[in-house]
Amino acid sequence: MNIPQALAKVVDNIDLSIEEMRDVMGQVMTGGATDAQIGALMVGLRMKSESLDEITGAVMVMRELVTGVTVENRQYLVDIVGTGGDGANLFNVSTASSFVAAAAGAHVAKHGGRSVSSQSGSADLLETAGIALDLSPAQIGQCVDNVGVGFMFAPNHHKAMKYAVGPRKELGMRTLFNILGPMTNPAGVQRLVMGVFSEKLCRPLAEVMGRLGGEHIMVVHSKDGLDEISLAARTHVAEFRDGEVKEYDLTPEDLGLGSDSLVGLDVTDSKASLALIKDAFGKRTTEAACKAADMIALNAGAAIYVSGITRTHKEGVSMAEDLIHNGEAAERMRELAQFSTALKVGDESH
C-alpha cells in the first residue's frame, strides 16, 4: 500500500490493517515519503485515533529497524519511560527512578531522548550529571550488566526516525511517534513501566505490548495529567501480565505513602532537575526534596515490581524508599557517571 492510498482510507475514518501499516511505516522510515505525506499521515491518524493494529504495525517496523543493545544478564531487565507531552515540566521522575530500581537489583535499560515537551529530557539530565551518552551499543550493554543501569539515547538507536524529525517539529503536536519510541526499547525489554499523556492510551498500549511479547507491562496516566504515577492524584493503570490486561486506579495511600501536592516539583532546566534529584537522594533539605523522594519511590516501586524483584507494587515502593534513604540510589548514579566516562575515555585513548 502506498501513502496516498493509506491517506485516502485514514481521512475516510477507516483503520489500516497491521500489514498496511507496516507497508506505510516502512516507507516513512526508509525515506520513501515526503514531509507533507508524513505530516498528513500523522495528523490523519491522530484525528481518527490510532487503532491497535496501526500501533502494532508501526511498532513492528520500528523494532525491525532499531540499532539494538545486547544485555548479557537479562534477569530483572526493565525500562521505565514516559511519552512526555504532559506539559507539567516536572523533574525527571522516570530517570531518577531508574537509579533506584538498579540499586534494588534490577537491570534497567533506560531509553529516552532530549527534551521534546518538558524543560529537561532524560538525556539533558544525564549529561548534566556527567554521564557519557555517546557510547556504542556494546558499551551501553556493559553499563547495564556492570552498574545495573545503562542509557540508550533514542536518536542513536532509531536512525530511521530521522525522516520524521522535520514534520514532527513543524507539526508541534503529539503524534503516533510519541508513543512508538517508548515501545521500541533497543535492548528488547519485555518488562516495562510506561507513562502516557492520555488515559485512553493505557489499555491499547498495554494490549499492543502484550501482543508483541511483553511479559509484565504497566501503562500509567494520572488524573492530574502526568505521564507518571502521581503523588497528588489517583493514577490509572493498565497492567498486562499472564496474557491479560487489568485496569485499576491507584493512590499513594494504596502504596503506603501519603498524598501531597506537586508544588516545587517543576523545574526550569536540567540543572534544576539534577539539583532536586540529588537533594531527594541525599539529605532532603527542602519540602520539595521530600516530595520528590516520595514521587520517585512510587515510580521506582513500579519498576521494581514489574522487573520481578517484588511480588507487589507496594513492596516495590517500600524497597525504593529504603534505597533512596540509605544513599544507595545516589551511589548508583555516581557509579554510572564513573563507569560510562571510563568507557568513553578508553575509547578516546585508542
Curated annotation (Swiss-Prot):
<feature type="binding site">
    <location>
        <position position="82"/>
    </location>
    <ligand>
        <name>anthranilate 1</name>
    </ligand>
</feature>
<comment type="similarity">
    <text>Belongs to the anthranilate phosphoribosyltransferase family.</text>
</comment>
<keyword id="KW-0328">Glycosyltransferase</keyword>
<feature type="binding site">
    <location>
        <begin position="92"/>
        <end position="95"/>
    </location>
    <ligand>
        <name>5-phospho-alpha-D-ribose 1-diphosphate</name>
    </ligand>
</feature>
<feature type="binding site">
    <location>
        <position position="228"/>
    </location>
    <ligand>
        <name>Mg(2+) 1</name>
    </ligand>
</feature>
<comment type="function">
    <text>Catalyzes the transfer of the phosphoribosyl group of 5-phosphorylribose-1-pyrophosphate (PRPP) to anthranilate to yield N-(5'-phosphoribosyl)-anthranilate (PRA).</text>
</comment>
<protein>
    <recommendedName>
        <fullName>Anthranilate phosphoribosyltransferase</fullName>
        <ecNumber>2.4.2.18</ecNumber>
    </recommendedName>
</protein>
<feature type="binding site">
    <location>
        <position position="227"/>
    </location>
    <ligand>
        <name>Mg(2+) 2</name>
    </ligand>
</feature>
<dbReference type="GO" id="GO:0005829">
    <property type="term" value="C:cytosol"/>
</dbReference>
<keyword id="KW-0479">Metal-binding</keyword>
<dbReference type="GO" id="GO:0000162">
    <property type="term" value="P:L-tryptophan biosynthetic process"/>
</dbReference>
<dbReference type="GO" id="GO:0000287">
    <property type="term" value="F:magnesium ion binding"/>
</dbReference>
<comment type="pathway">
    <text>Amino-acid biosynthesis; L-tryptophan biosynthesis; L-tryptophan from chorismate: step 2/5.</text>
</comment>
<dbReference type="Pfam" id="PF02885">
    <property type="entry name" value="Glycos_trans_3N"/>
</dbReference>
<keyword id="KW-0460">Magnesium</keyword>
<keyword id="KW-0057">Aromatic amino acid biosynthesis</keyword>
<feature type="binding site">
    <location>
        <position position="94"/>
    </location>
    <ligand>
        <name>Mg(2+) 1</name>
    </ligand>
</feature>
<feature type="binding site">
    <location>
        <position position="122"/>
    </location>
    <ligand>
        <name>5-phospho-alpha-D-ribose 1-diphosphate</name>
    </ligand>
</feature>
<comment type="subunit">
    <text>Homodimer.</text>
</comment>
<feature type="binding site">
    <location>
        <position position="82"/>
    </location>
    <ligand>
        <name>5-phospho-alpha-D-ribose 1-diphosphate</name>
    </ligand>
</feature>
<dbReference type="Pfam" id="PF00591">
    <property type="entry name" value="Glycos_transf_3"/>
</dbReference>
<dbReference type="InterPro" id="IPR035902">
    <property type="entry name" value="Nuc_phospho_transferase"/>
</dbReference>
<feature type="binding site">
    <location>
        <position position="168"/>
    </location>
    <ligand>
        <name>anthranilate 2</name>
    </ligand>
</feature>
<feature type="binding site">
    <location>
        <position position="228"/>
    </location>
    <ligand>
        <name>Mg(2+) 2</name>
    </ligand>
</feature>
<dbReference type="GO" id="GO:0004048">
    <property type="term" value="F:anthranilate phosphoribosyltransferase activity"/>
</dbReference>
<keyword id="KW-0028">Amino-acid biosynthesis</keyword>
<dbReference type="InterPro" id="IPR000312">
    <property type="entry name" value="Glycosyl_Trfase_fam3"/>
</dbReference>
<dbReference type="InterPro" id="IPR005940">
    <property type="entry name" value="Anthranilate_Pribosyl_Tfrase"/>
</dbReference>
<dbReference type="InterPro" id="IPR036320">
    <property type="entry name" value="Glycosyl_Trfase_fam3_N_dom_sf"/>
</dbReference>
<feature type="binding site">
    <location>
        <begin position="110"/>
        <end position="118"/>
    </location>
    <ligand>
        <name>5-phospho-alpha-D-ribose 1-diphosphate</name>
    </ligand>
</feature>
<dbReference type="InterPro" id="IPR017459">
    <property type="entry name" value="Glycosyl_Trfase_fam3_N_dom"/>
</dbReference>
<feature type="binding site">
    <location>
        <begin position="85"/>
        <end position="86"/>
    </location>
    <ligand>
        <name>5-phospho-alpha-D-ribose 1-diphosphate</name>
    </ligand>
</feature>
<keyword id="KW-0808">Transferase</keyword>
<keyword id="KW-0822">Tryptophan biosynthesis</keyword>
